[in-house]
Amino acid sequence: HNGVDLICESGLYIKSRTHGMVTKIGYPYDPADEKKGHLRYVEVSFDGNRFRYFYLDPMVQVGDKIVAGDVIGCSQDLTEIYTGITQHFHFEWIGPDGEFVDPTSMFDLL
């Protein structure tokens, strides 16, 4: 499990932690999957780094320039798919070398 899951309510506006450009809007699962195919992610890239925000309805398009703090989407409801799951979005940081970086340094965590 690369990245970090951050607890949130469904429908919460998710803001970019960095500036950059939207380089991908993708599906973490096969879009034909009746159960999970609607789940999406947004990738924001800056200086060779890629930041991925999973399980949100995108409010941006590929090519959009992003400033840190811009809303990029709304969190999707995972409880409809996984009974008993804690509602969350998933955040990943992939460094310029293609390796995953621990993203917790980007958040004020206690």
Model features per residue range: what roles?
Residues 1:
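Short proline/glycine- and basic residue-enriched helix-capping loop/turn segments at helix->loop/beta transitions
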Residues 8-10:
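Short, small/polar residue-rich loop motifs at catalytic or cofactor-binding pockets
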Residues 12, 49-50, 97-99:
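Short acidic/polar mixed-charge low-complexity motifs
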Residues 13-25, 60-77:
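Short, well-structured beta-strand-loop connectors
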Residues 16-59, 81-90:
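Zn2+-dependent peptidoglycan hydrolase active-site motif and core
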Residues 34-38, 64-110:
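Conserved, short, structured surface segments that act as functional micro-motifs
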